[in-house]
């Protein structure tokens, strides 16, 4: 049996997908990962085979740096960093405006490459990152059964009257003004409609008889998997999801790091672990505020 895993060329996306695939590996099955060159070392470390697939312009092997991105993507990354300095709404607005170029980059080309990979690998099962829209177009276009994995918070898959990119809830301490949120929703609704039109145009190219989508951000695969604990998800929202399975957290084993072990052993005090993710970690000012706190 062969499992095909399709992931963007970002370590943060690949790690949980690769961890999920260890269940197949433990049974002696073959695992093939379709992703880019930047995360090749991650694929090899898990003991998997790799098929080359470029789902977007950017990549992140673990630590993201604008100067290591291709032309155009470097400026986009710097623009996003600048937007985070202006606040949460500014960051969300920046992401919304870049969404089509980001998530549907070279949509038909990516879709056809995915179809070619499926033809070469002949997988018995396929799991794909929910945000790999170009890859999912390829699978849907060729009617390849697949599991669609939502890696982040479940709101990455919109339900009900939610609009992608417009958080349905906010922490009280940082909730923006109602006017800002209203403007953000209008922007995100426009992006949703444009994105869905792009999705439908690509899908029609790939399979003319396919049913067009009303909201591409709400589309799911044959099996929906959520990398999130069911106990932490609002029951009202769970009731609106299509058939699904909550996976909990993708906990993986990693080799012990002697340098980290020595650092921890040198001080018997409590340790607070603050995980900001790749993008906020590129903000020295944010790190400087977090450390004293």
Regions found by a protein language model. Give the residues of each.
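Generic beta-sheet signal
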Residues: 6, 34, 53-56, 147-151, ...
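Conserved nucleotide-sugar donor-binding subdomain of glycosyltransferases
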Residues: 69-133, 179-215
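Donor-nucleotide binding loops and adjacent catalytic segments primarily
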Residues: 227-293
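Conserved nucleotide-sugar donor-interacting segment of glycosyltransferase catalytic cores
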Residues: 63, 97-179, 231-232
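Active-site-proximal region of nucleotide-activated glycan assembly enzymes
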Residues: 145-233
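N-terminal subdomain of nucleotide-sugar transferases
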Residues: 1-58
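Conserved nucleotide-sugar phosphate-binding/catalytic loop shared by glycosyltransferases and other
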Residues: 34, 38-91
